[in-house]
């Protein structure tokens, strides 16, 4: 099930229509773009609601969005992934265990450690991660030099969108992880994302992106785009 972007969520909530911009257009013209948006709506007033339940349009009908998400996560793990990838039912607990460990740990992963933790081979761990990526439970980030992701070891793993974080993560206080997950979920459908190594993301083989929270400032390099929250207007590379 494809989800709503924050732009689409704002359109549903406010009744306004907003243009679609490429990542490059936002980087180059965000100071002008935001003027048009703020004439109609204050996006920050809707941001936390989107993080909690706005990705899936079912929120318009389903009040208990957490129960809905948990039900669909289980359906995906117990039926969709095993059916599409010929996984024997006896291995379902391994699949669920891997998801739980990955999403409640650091986004940087160690395949050998995961293999030992759930008791399967490294190749099986990689397969399971790719299966969950294809099922839109996870997003995998690979080295910036990688052209073909099939079968490769990811450098980082994130849940597919922040609503899933709200449903399955034990630690609800890691706001930086929420912001990173949000940004990745917005970009992955429209841009090529890679693990940067230097910063948080390498976008379209060109842009170094660093994620900050609560208006925090980065190192101020012109070559690095700073993505921060809780501000209505950015300036230059922020």
Regions found by a protein language model. Give the residues of each.
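Interdomain motor-coupling "hinge/lid" segment immediately C-terminal to the ATP-binding subdomain
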Residues: 1-95
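Short, surface-exposed amphipathic charged segments that create phosphate/polyanion-binding patches used
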Residues: 14-17, 154-155, 237-238
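A short acidic, often aromatic-flanked loop/helix-cap motif at beta-alpha or helix-coil junctions
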Residues: 4-8, 165, 231-236
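Conserved catalytic cores of phosphodiester-cleaving nucleases, focusing on short active-site segments
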Residues: 20, 183, 187, 199-217
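Well-ordered beta-strand scaffold positions
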Residues: 55, 206-207, 238
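Catalytic cores of nucleic-acid endonucleases
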Residues: 194-198, 213-238
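Accessory nucleic acid-recognition modules appended to NTPase machines
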Residues: 57-199
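A structure-centric signal for secondary-structure junctions around beta-strands
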Residues: 47, 153-154, 221
């Amino acid at each position: 099930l494809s989800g709503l972007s924050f732009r689409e969520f704002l359109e549903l909530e406010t009744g306004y229509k907003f243009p679609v911009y490429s990542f490059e257009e936002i980087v180059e013209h965000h100071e002008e773009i935001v003027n048009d948006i703020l004439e109609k709506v204050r996006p920050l007033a809707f941001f936390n609601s989107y993080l909690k339940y706005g990705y899936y349009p079912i929120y318009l009908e389903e009040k208990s969005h957490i129960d809905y998400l948990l039900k669909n996560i289980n359906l995906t793990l117990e039926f969709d992934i095993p059916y599409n990838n010929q996984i024997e039912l006896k291995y379902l607990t391994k699949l669920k265990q891997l998801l739980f460990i990955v999403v409640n740990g650091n986004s940087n992963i160690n395949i050998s450690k995961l293999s030992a933790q759930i008791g399967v081979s490294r190749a099986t761990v990689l397969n399971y991660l790719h299966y969950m990526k294809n099922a839109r439970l996870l997003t995998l980030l690979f080295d910036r030099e990688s052209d073909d992701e099939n079968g490769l070891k990811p450098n980082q793993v994130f849940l597919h969108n922040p609503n899933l974080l709200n449903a399955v993560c034990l630690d609800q206080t890691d706001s930086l992880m929420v912001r990173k997950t949000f940004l990745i979920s917005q970009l992955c459908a429209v841009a090529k994302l890679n693990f940067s190594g230097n910063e948080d993301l390498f976008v379209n083989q060109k842009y170094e992106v660093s994620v900050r929270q609560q208006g925090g400032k980065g190192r101020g390099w012109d070559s690095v785009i700073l993505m921060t929250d809780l501000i209505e207007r950015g300036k230059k590379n922020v």
